[in-house]
């Protein structure tokens, strides 16, 4: 039996979400239509509202409803520090630690030549202009510790160092509360190499 075209369109739309394959999308679509139509309508309204009202901050490139986000407008932040992250979600995680009081630049991705993502797609020129504004003294590279994140950090670091900026990278190591027997060998090796005196 062929499913209705409206349902097929919903399944296809849900597949656009990261990590959602055809089966998961179909389960979600059927759940929304069978058990949670109010939730489906709320989801639809929220998606429409977000697409109509969210834009990228002119300074840091994160999502905002205004031209400039609240973080960039906060005069109590240290404008000499610029932390580079891959996504707005990464920025939020750093903010939740309440340990960083500088400004941000959100790449909206990471270098991945195999996927067609180069410097242009991660707003590299905007980052260089922002970091070279004469105010920024240190750039903290907080890209993820994946192969692509490491390649992105290396590329950005080389370019920004050549412009006379101090470039630092987040430390890596054993997570807080982590037990060595459950940590992978690469993480333990990096923690050993990055050890510091007490």
UniProtKB/Swiss-Prot annotation:
One of its GO terms (biological process) is DNA recombination. PROSITE patterns: RECR (PS01300), TOPRIM (PS50880). InterPro entries: DNA_Rcmb_RecR, Rcmb_RecR, Rcmb_RecR_Znf, TOPRIM_dom, TOPRIM_RecR. Residues 80-175 form the Toprim domain. Belongs to the RecR family. PANTHER family: RECOMBINATION PROTEIN RECR. This is Recombination protein RecR.
